[in-house]
Each structure stands twice: as structure tokens, then as C-alpha cells.
Amino acid sequence: MASLTDLVNLNLSDTTEKIIAEYIWIGGSGMDLRSKARTLSGPVTDPSKLPKWNYDGSSTGQAPGEDSEVILYPQAIFKDPFRKGNNILVMCDCYTPAGEPIPTNKRHNAAKIFSSPEVASEEPWYGIEQEYTLLQKDINWPLGWPVGGFPGPQGPYYCGIGADKSFGRDIVDSHYKACLYAGINISGINGEVMPGQWEFQVGPSVGISAGDQVWVARYILERITEIAGVVVSFDPKPIPGDWNGAGAHTNYSTKSMRNDGGYEIIKSAIEKLKLRHKEHISAYGEGNERRLTGRHETADINTFSWGVANRGASVRVGRETEQNGKGYFEDRRPASNMDPYIVTSMIAETTIIWKP
């Protein structure tokens, strides 16, 4: 008799043309991911060729029980690193039966911003640094930390190696490879300043694809931690006190910024971000006030600042960008639990469309 592992790893393409499509969507909290699978008659590579589907929105906090149907619109396809073969992961957004985006569907508005001629012509690039914390399942305490106690002070853990400094690398490396397999433009990983905390980077990605890729990378991470029996937290300050928080620094450039003379465009864009600081902060994640304290490589939440190579600023410009007179900048304000659809489209809207 086949073992469970053998059955999990069955290669369907040996015996059938049919494939499994895992439809993924964002749940009622705006941060929880949900998914369910369906059988398709054969391989699909174009999301517009996929059928719409529905789910019980009353069970995800997105619809009342008496009118519970929410419709899934397939938007992006990735290879499935769990089922392999021709099987796929499908990132969807959510609509009412009448075709209206539901309140938690932030992709719809982002796609409108990115498809506007002003923004599309600037080809906005994003590189998103997603930090997260691995927790022991039953006690919600960081991986590698003594139960009820604390590890030694921060210092040796950032990009550290060794059993006393690095906790959960097997999860991190599995996630890295699974994202590459899926077709996500994951560009790197590293251990973070707080033990049990890690980061992966997605990008450069253009426009709406940045949000799609970050959400599916989060989904894959949740699935891998599920297998490992570990909990992943995107809380921006999981442990109070003298420990680093978790952010989602967002690196950004437009075609004008990448061309000669781009540094002046960058400075103009940063000035616009300063003028809309409060609006951006309110959209940059829940609980960010616990993280943006002016300590632990953050700027104070109430004060906008920018600087070259300054990791204590709201916005950092790299030394290389300053020297070359063109390049990109990093918005360091977004929290680890931010919605990448909101953050990426808002940065584009403020810096390209908005007129002070």
C-alpha cells in the first residue's frame, strides 16, 4: 500500500490531462488568506481562460448569511509548488454577484490606478522587503526563544548562522525555492535583527504584479509553516520592548527616476509623500504605531523625514542613487501586515497622479 507521502507526491500528468487549480483570496480581516481547489480539464496559463467561482462569504466575514455568495475572479496564475506538474495557484479578487468589488477587494482600485495612462507610461517598479516572525505554535512565542524567557540581546542574529543564532532556516529556504518554482520574482532572503524573524524580498515587479506576487508568496509561506507546525506572524511589533519590529519596506522607481536626471524627480516625489504623510500612514498597516517609534531603525510615526543611507528616516535614498543622479528610493514606513495592493498603488498615485 502506498504511503501518505507517496500519495501526496503523485504525479497526475502520468495518468490524466486534468489539473488542480487552487483558488486563493483575501478574507474578511484583509490579512487572512483563504483557498480552495477545483479540477480543470487541462492545463491553463491565461487567467482570463479560468472559470469564475464562488464561496460562502458569511464564513469569512465578507457577506451576510442570507446573501452569502461572493464571486472569485481569477487574476494571476502561478505554478503550484506543492502539487507540482501542471497544477496551479490562482490569485483571485472578490466581487458581489452584481459585479461590484467587495470592501476587502483592494486589488480592483489598485488595478485602475496602474492601468491609467499616466502611471502605465512610467512603468513603476517595486521591490518589497517582507519581514515576518516565526512562532512556536501552542505558546505564540518566537521560534528559538526559551519558553517564558528571552534570548540574549540583539546583535548576533541579523544574517547570523549557527544553532544559537538562526531559527527556522529550513522553512525559509523551502519558501525561497517554492517561490522560485511558482514563478514569483523573489530576489533574496535574510535573517533579521530579532531572533526568529526573517525577511524575503519580492521584485523588481511592475505595477499590479507586485501585489499579486507578495500575496502569493505569503500564501506559500503560510502553507509551508502549516506543514512545519509553526505559526507565521506579520504583526509589526510581535514582542514589546527592546526588539526590532517587522516592516515591509517598499522600494520604488519610475521610468523618469531611472533615467538621467532622475534624482530631481525622486526628490520631488519624496516631497509629495511628505505632504500626504498622514494619509499614507493610515493605509500602511495595523498596529504600526507600536513599530514606528523612532527607535530600532524606524522613524517616528508622526514625523516625516528622508535622508541618504539613513535607516532612521521615513524614506531612504541609497548612496548609489545619489551618486548616479538616478535610481530608486525606499519607503520604510509600511508595516509587515500592510496590503501590497494599497501601498504600491498609493505610492504611484501620490508620486505620479496627485497634484499638491
UniProtKB/Swiss-Prot annotation:
Highly expressed in leaf blades, at intermediate levels in spikelets (rice flower) and at lower levels in roots. One of its GO terms (molecular function) is glutamine synthetase activity. Disruption phenotype: Plants show marked reduction in leaf blades elongation, plant height, panicle size and grain filling. Coiled coil: none annotated. Its main location: cytoplasm. Residues 106-356 form the GS catalytic domain. It is found in: Cytoplasm. It catalyses: L-glutamate + NH4(+) + ATP = L-glutamine + ADP + phosphate + H(+). InterPro entries: Gln_synt_N, Gln_synt_N_sf, Gln_synth/guanido_kin_cat_dom, Gln_synth_cat_dom, Gln_synth_gly_rich_site, Gln_synth_N_conserv_site, Glutamine_Synthetase. Its EC number is 6.3.1.2. Pfam families: Gln-synt_C (PF00120), Gln-synt_N (PF03951). Induction: Induced in roots under nitrogen-limited condition. Down-regulated in roots under ammonium supply. Down-regulated by treatment with cadmium. Residues 19-99 form the GS beta-grasp domain. GO terms for biological process: glutamine biosynthetic process. Disulfide bonds: none annotated. Plants overexpressing GLN1-1 exhibit a poor plant growth phenotype and yield, and decreased carbon/nitrogen ratio in the stem caused by the accumulation of nitrogen in the stem. Belongs to the glutamine synthetase family. High-affinity glutamine synthetase involved in ammonium assimilation. Seems to be a major component of the cytosolic glutamine synthetic pathway in leaf blades. Plays an important role in maintaining carbon and nitrogen metabolic balance during ammonium assimilation in shoots and roots, thus controlling plant growth and development. Plays an important role in maintaining broad range of metabolites and transcripts involved in the maintenance of plant metabolic homeostasis and development of plastid in roots. Homooctamer. This is Glutamine synthetase cytosolic isozyme 1-1. It comes from Oryza sativa subsp. japonica. The lineage of its organism: Eukaryota, Viridiplantae, Streptophyta, Embryophyta, Tracheophyta.
